[in-house]
Amino acid sequence: MSAYTVSQLAHNAGVSVHIVRDYLVRGLLRPVACTTGGYGVFDDAALQRLCFVRAAFEAGIGLDALARLCRALDAADGAQAAAQLAVVRQLVERRRAALAHLDAQLASMPAERAHEEALP
């Protein structure tokens, strides 16, 4: 098992320390242990979760929905975790549909059609 400090976790996930601390406050992450000095220690599962949360956030999933999912997973409440996973999946599908609609609109723009017509 790897052990990470906040700064190591942030570095490995490609985010700032401020993001990691914000996610800690929101309940998206939690340390597996604390040092005698009170510093959080994180494991590979925390790194994986941080990468997931960041990817979901960048894809347009709100931190509130992600926090509800993480709390359910941390509580080992299978029914609640399944319900929150369904909510996040629904948000992902809505985002996919919105992006597909946007892509169709972009394709119908005059500049896009002119570019396609100019291709050999």
From Swiss-Prot:
PROSITE patterns: HTH_MERR_2. Keywords: DNA-binding, Mercuric resistance, Plasmid, Transcription, Transcription regulation. GO terms for biological process: negative regulation of DNA-templated transcription; response to mercury ion. InterPro entries: DNA-bd_dom_put_sf (IPR009061), MerD (IPR011797), MerR-type_HTH_dom (IPR000551), MerR_fam (IPR047057). Residues 6-25 bind DNA. The keyword DNA-binding applies. SMART domains: HTH_MERR. GO terms for molecular function: DNA binding; DNA-binding transcription factor activity. Residues 3-72 form the HTH merR-type domain. It comes from the Bacteria. The keyword Nuclease does not apply. SUPFAM superfamilies: Putative DNA-binding domain. This is HTH-type transcriptional regulator MerD. It comes from Shigella flexneri. The gene is merD.
